[in-house]
Amino acid sequence: MATYKGIQGFTIQNLSADPSNFEEGQVWYNSTSNVWKVTDVATVGSWATGNNLNTARKQLAGAGTQTEALAFGGANPPAVMLDSTEEYNGTSWTSNPTGLNTARRGLEGCGIQTAALAFGGELNPQPTNSSSTEEYNGATWTTIPPGLNTARANLGGCGTQTAGLAFGGGPSITGATEEYNGTSWATNPTGLNTARQFLGGTGTQTAGLAFGGNPGSPPFNTTATEEYDGSTWTSNPTGLNTARRFFTGTGIQTAAVAFGGYIDPSATNTGATELYDGSTWTSSPASMNTARNGLGSAGTQSAALGFGGEPVTAATEEWTGPGALVTKTITVS
């Protein structure tokens, strides 16, 4: 009788824990859980519930990756603006006692856990827009004056701490676009083709993506998608499948994921998830477990993180996109 070793040339590993680095088709026996396991490629995406934020909030910002994420700012009812900052390690959130210098909601962020950027937002008393820009070094936030040239809230953004991009926002709805060089913001006279607030954004300063949002006129939600090349915005005639506002997204211009938000005319929250390939949006059969708007995000199209949101929640969810390697338990069925 043929054996696995004879066919493959090696024996199956006996491990007390699943390996942190694995390859497609790798098989092992987990001696702790007493099951056989294999690594396979996910054919569709899926959401899994993670550990909650320490501070429940809405209209917060995020940065980083699925295993090294950052959550900051936001609000708790009725209108308490937050400066609190939390770091995620792939399992749990840890609060940093040193928060933002300017507590606010409806702000935007970009960068990584140890080098993040926060900008814009809404202050008390409402409605007071903020232009404040802060840099995070993994421990503390530093305010960088003078901030955005156009103070605004509920804007889109993307990029890094030294090459950021801000676009759109409200409540006086704008398409204004600004670029950050690590020291100051410069206004690009060419703004979004569709001015809007409560939009999603992701990518880099020279390859940005703007999608969805509220253009300020009925039906108040748009599917509009635009790509930025470092100079101008180009509208993609193929927009989102679900028009929405107050949602989020992450990834790059050619591989993005959008999720959550608020939809009309049903006036309900959604957990709908869509994938962008640089040309078209495709609706995923998998929706978030907790439908919500005003949430934060981090990560990539294949490994994203969604957290917080409204109704005010601390819920965290991890997204595994199609094509990602996943661990499965081998059964006889």
Predicted regions and their residues:
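Polar, enzyme-active/binding microenvironments
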Residues: 1-333
